[in-house]
Amino acid sequence: MARAVGIDLGTTNSVVAVLEGGDPVVVANSEGSRTTPSIVAFARNGEVLVGQPAKNQAVTNVDRTIRSVKRHMGTDWSIEIDGKKYTAQEISARVLMKLKRDAEAYLGEDITDAVITVPAYFNDAQRQATKEAGQIAGLNVLRIVNEPTAAALAYGLDKGEKEQTILVFDLGGGTFDVSLLEIGEGVVEVRATSGDNHLGGDDWDDRIVNWLVDKFKGTSGIDLTKDKMAMQRLREAAEKAKIELSSSQSTSINLPYITVDADKNPLFLDEQLTRAEFQRITQDLLDRTRQPFKSVIADAGISVSDIDHVVLVGGSTRMPAVTDLVKELTGGKEPNKGVNPDEVVAVGAALQAGVLKGEVKDVLLLDVTPLSLGIETKGGVMTKLIERNTTIPTKRSETFTTADDNQPSVQIQVYQGEREIAAHNKLLGSFELTGIPPAPRGVPQIEVTFDIDANGIVHVTAKDKGTGKENTIKIQEGSGLSKEEIDRMIKDAEAHAEEDRKRREEADVRNQAESLVYQTEKFVKDQREAEGGSKVPEETLSKVDAAIADAKTALGGTDITAIKSAMEKLGQESQALGQAIYEATQAESAQAGGPDGAAAGGGSGSADDVVDAEVVDDDRESK
């Protein structure tokens, strides 16, 4: 049975985990790190870089480096590189493909199935887009799981049978969620969830960048926002400063040669940022986490004192101000320190993958839909069929009627959100039910059914009870990708995977050829410079020289077949040289030994007397 992995596809960093003997293990990437930056870059030589290599070259390749694409999931965002448009799904798929490759290298087998996590407050379009990214990456997405739910699963699975209430405070690179869950007897049930899809560590970084821009403008009069390369350096410095301020009271931000003045003199940026100043310029961001917390407590119908454990998720929760706020909101409760906020979501996803594959027994995960779902009815009102925080999967039906006499069809407009007026919510999709027989208004009965699957993806059906006619829609307009487009992107991704494989193979061939040229060249040089001259004729050495020259010429080009051919020829000439040296050495030994030499060589010294034997380790034999 194929293995399944758990993937935390994050805004700034992503993690992959797998079950080994029933226990979740976080897989280190090819660079040796347990987290992979969610960054994709298109190098000018055509290579696509993902993760740390992409991050390393971001300063010198600003326009072709894409980060924080998770914030664009479920929208019509795209970026054009070399005349080709890439959607958010395609960029995310690149990150997923790297995680898949790294996990396959670790396990030594192919991976086809995955559980991918999303912020609890992701709407239908964002979930659908995440699933599509997985498909483009060549993964069968078994389940889309909410990040706080995965974290609670990882945290609470070994906490015994006593029922406990857990608050998960998840502040990542680009999104914020707070969820209340109940765990007991192998059941993980989400009671309520709330959040903000546009609040995360990136916003804290941006505040430091803006602060640095203002400081520099005040001292030099130059606006760095007009210099893309300088802004990229500021972003990297801001992220580093934010991390340092989690453990220090102040940090130095020193960027030499950040720009030049009107006279082309280099200018330096050197600022000291204190933790107090950092907290002052980001206080409003922190305050934005308060309301979702209050909403969750109210929706779950509990008091703060009922919370047994607080789990912090996401690297941004390492900021002292965030930890202090959580303690304040929970009445002084100390957040749990036993989980790694960067890895716990992927660990939970791997456990859920194990549940779905039957590797983990007696665990039931009951998730919820984060936002209400309904349709637009007369007067533009949002009529909710499924309230937010309803446990999924779920199915609800309600009967509606026509608004006008002899109305031949009804337009079903599906919305997601909490506003009373439908237009103020997110339109997920619409479809029409036609063929309703003529009848006075209020007579036809149209049954509308909402069905949410375990991934949180919505299916809506409208049925005329009188005629039995029905129409169904699977909500996917939000992502804007048709099946044909997804198939095309999958093929593109596969083609690029083949390109990447070829590129790696070419690099290996080139490296082998260069190494062979170097070693052979050195060997020939040593022969010519040997005391007493070379043991082999110059003619033999010249043939090797010619093969070396051919190999160098091939290496100067791009034809890999030519390099392989030249390498093969050089290998043959090298072997011939080695054989000639061996024969010359044997001949010398025979001449030097005379009659005694023949005896020492084992009798007559003829080739027929050579004996096949094994070399024995004397030390081992004597033991």
From Swiss-Prot:
Keywords: ATP-binding, Chaperone, Nucleotide-binding, Phosphoprotein, Stress response. CDD domains: ASKHA_NBD_HSP70_DnaK-like. One of its GO terms (molecular function) is ATP-dependent protein folding chaperone. The keyword rRNA-binding does not apply. Residues 609-623 have a biased composition (Acidic residues). Induction: By stress conditions e.g. heat shock. Residues 594-605 have a biased composition (Gly residues). InterPro entries: ATPase_NBD (IPR043129), Chaperone_DnaK (IPR012725), Heat_shock_70_CS (IPR018181), HSP70_C_sf (IPR029048), HSP70_peptide-bd_sf (IPR029047), Hsp_70_fam (IPR013126). The modification Phosphothreonine is found at residue 175. It holds the Pfam family HSP70. Residues 587-623 are annotated as: Disordered. Acts as a chaperone. Belongs to the heat shock protein 70 family. This is Chaperone protein DnaK. It comes from Mycobacterium avium (strain 104).
